[in-house]
Structure formats: structure tokens, C-alpha cells
Amino acid sequence: MRFIPLQTEQQVSCWAAQHIINRINDFKPTAERPFVLGLPTGGTPLKTYQELIRLYQAGKVSFKHVVTFNMDEYVALPEEHPESYHSFMYNNFFNHIDILPENINILNGNTDDHNAECRRYEEKIKSYGKIHLFMGGVGVDGHIAFNEPASSLSSRTRIKTLTQDTLIANSRFFNNDVTQVPKYALTIGVGTLLDAEEVMILATGHQKALAVQAAVEGSINHLWTVSALQMHRHFLLVCDEAAQQELKVKTVKYFTELEGAVAGTDYQDK
């Protein structure tokens, strides 16, 4: 595990964006050999997407030979709905960069056969070999993608019933009306995420502190699905100060010393 303890949400966003760009540019992708990037939705990655757009506009990176796979999508919510994850990704990222439409992959929650759609998605990922970098967030209860507490840690892409906590958390996007939030979603599995070459999880805000503690100091536990990433060879956790509040002081000190002088290297403090 590589743990990056930063101070502010903006630092987390800039660090993450620069890491993604470094990975893409070092890979030197081509049409025949694209860089495969996994992406999340939600509030946490928004500023990272804004920073990626800024750096793209500054000529620091091209997404022309990048293939993306999103983590999840609601079931039975039209793609054109403003709160669908299709809408989120296009409005907040894809419409502002040079990615090719055919290289964008998002689960279709409006098919007649959800199981077939999930199998298709897994096969599409396998057709590229692997996802080189999967960025994600983490829920207050430690869920990753829509792998809610007690999900199988070897799970693959499938349909999931959302917990009441998740429905309440996501109701802020639906006029704070829990009844408007879809009850089901298609999501990559924990096993799908573990197959990625590198996983980078972003955590900001004090409400994520218990999940961060479970990921860093806790034991592997299906009630905190983020803890499964302790088994990953290249797991990167990037947090602001508020999200570190439940960690032991010596834990933060240990990882800070490992990173050395982080400031001025992988992120810009703006």
C-alpha cells in the first residue's frame, strides 16, 4: 500500500490528476496499444476531473488513445437523466477532452438482461488485457463502487441492491428525496477492481475517516469492502487531513516519512 497523507481536498485532486497524467504519458499510448483507465462518479473526483481538464487544455496530456471503463450505473434510470452516471461523466469530463466516443465504456442500466450486460462488460475489459489504473472513491461505510458492506471480496460485475445508507447519501443528487434514488445499480465487483494493475482511491472529508482507518489499519473484512485493497500489489490511497482523523498519529507519521518531501513533486498546492 502507498498512502499519501495531504492537507486539503484541492491537494488531493491535483495530486491524483498529475498521477493519472504521468501514468498516461509514461505509457505512451497508441491506437493499437491504448492506456486503459477506470473512472468513478460522485462528489470526490469532481475536482480531479476539473484539474485533468485544465491540464488537457494546457497541452499536458491527450486522451485520444485512452480507453475508459466506469465503475457503475443506476438501473432503470435513463441515460439522458441529469443524475445518470452517463450524464455525469459527459458533463463533467468527457465533453471537455479529446477522448474518442468509441473508447468510452459505461454500464447500461436499461437493458432487458442485466446479467448479460454485466458479462459483456467483463469481457470487454478482458479484451484490453487489463485496466492499467482504476481511480475510485470510497463510501462512508467503506464501500467501493456499489460493492456495499458484506459484498463478496471476489465478486465480478453484477446487479446490486443499494443500502439505505447509500440511498440517503445519494439523495442529495435527487432533491434530497430518497424515494427518487434508484434502488439498484450495476457495478464492477471487488474482484474486478483487484484485477486492475493499479488502484487509486481518493478520500476527502471527516465523514470518510472511518473508511480510511479500515483501509489502512483494519483487517480485511467484507463489511468494509475497501479493506480488500490491502491485498492489491499497487494500492494507492490519497487523503486530505480531515479523512485522516481516525488514524493513529504514528501511522500518518510513518507514511509521511515514506513519501519524503511530497510537496512540490506530485501535486500542486493551489
Swiss-Prot record:
Pfam families (alphabetical): Glucosamine_iso (PF01182)
Catalytic activity: alpha-D-glucosamine 6-phosphate + H2O = beta-D-fructose 6-phosphate + NH4(+)
Molecular function via GO: glucosamine-6-phosphate deaminase activity; identical protein binding
Keywords noted in UniProt: Allosteric enzyme, Carbohydrate metabolism, Hydrolase
Signal peptide: none
This protein's record includes keyword Hydrolase: yes
Residues the record marks as active site: 72, 141, 143, 148
Site (Part of the allosteric site): 151, 158, 160-161, 254
Membrane-spanning intervals of the chain: none
GO cellular component labels: cytoplasm
UniProt note on regulation of activity: Allosterically activated by N-acetylglucosamine 6-phosphate (GlcNAc6P).
Pathway: Amino-sugar metabolism; N-acetylneuraminate degradation; D-fructose 6-phosphate from N-acetylneuraminate: step 5/5
Gene Ontology biological process: carbohydrate metabolic process; glucosamine catabolic process; N-acetylglucosamine catabolic process; N-acetylneuraminate catabolic process
InterPro entries to which the protein is assigned, alphabetical: Glc/Gal-6P_isomerase, Glucosamine6P_isomerase, Glucosamine6P_isomerase_CS, NagB/RpiA_transferase-like
Nucleotide-binding among keywords: no
Gene3D superfamilies attached to this UniProt entry: 3.40.50.1360
Its EC number(s): 3.5.99.6
Record text on subunit structure and interactions: Homohexamer.
Protein role: Catalyzes the reversible isomerization-deamination of glucosamine 6-phosphate (GlcN6P) to form fructose 6-phosphate (Fru6P) and ammonium ion.
Family named by the database record: Belongs to the glucosamine/galactosamine-6-phosphate isomerase family. NagB subfamily.
Protein name: Glucosamine-6-phosphate deaminase
Annotated gene: nagB
